[in-house]
Amino acid sequence: MELDIKGIMDRLPHRYPMLLIDRVLEMVPGKSIVAIKNVSINEPFFTGHFPHHPVMPGVLIVEAMAQASALFSFTDENGGLKCDGAKTAYYLVGIDGARFRKPVVPGDQLRLEVEAERLSRTICKYQGRALVDGQLVAEAKLMCAIRSLEE
């Protein structure tokens, strides 16, 4: 399954400047995703990180992996939504083994590959990788919590 920006925005609450997924190339609901983030010099974080040598902050690469994980975790086998996004919160609650191997700079296309290690109704664990031109630039294990906003 693929998603364009409209499909992504239908599923994620994030908006500019925090929406960090531009396209989904492959998605197996509940299992894995391959998504793209096109890195532009127009990103607001490049103003201060760093003006003389712009580098995408590693924490935002990890956030992009977390957003990708939300996309496939909340999509059912038929491409529909498993839950009402207006009534559900998805929090990044843990990051283990994060490694940043190469800088990500304007003009790069970040390929995000995330696989589920464990999914439950309240806690999910994932393995995420970010690549540029086929080279690993970052990786991390993520843990996310799912909470009802009605509680």
Swiss-Prot record:
InterPro entries: FabA_FabZ (IPR013114), FabZ (IPR010084), HotDog_dom_sf (IPR029069). It catalyses: a (3R)-hydroxyacyl-[ACP] = a (2E)-enoyl-[ACP] + H2O. Involved in unsaturated fatty acids biosynthesis. Catalyzes the dehydration of short chain beta-hydroxyacyl-ACPs and long chain saturated and unsaturated beta-hydroxyacyl-ACPs. The keyword Cytoplasm applies. CDD domains: FabZ. The active site is at residue 49. Belongs to the thioester dehydratase family. FabZ subfamily. Its EC number is 4.2.1.59. It is an enzyme of class 4 (lyase). The keyword Lipid metabolism applies. GO terms for biological process: fatty acid biosynthetic process; lipid A biosynthetic process. It comes from the Bacteria. This is 3-hydroxyacyl-[acyl-carrier-protein] dehydratase FabZ. It is found in: Cytoplasm. It comes from Bordetella pertussis (strain Tohama I / ATCC BAA-589 / NCTC 13251). One of its GO terms (molecular function) is (3R)-hydroxyacyl-[acyl-carrier-protein] dehydratase activity. Keywords: Cytoplasm, Lipid A biosynthesis, Lipid biosynthesis, Lipid metabolism, Lyase. It holds the Pfam family FabA. GO terms for cellular component: cytoplasm; membrane. Signal peptide: none annotated. HAMAP family: FabZ (MF_00406).
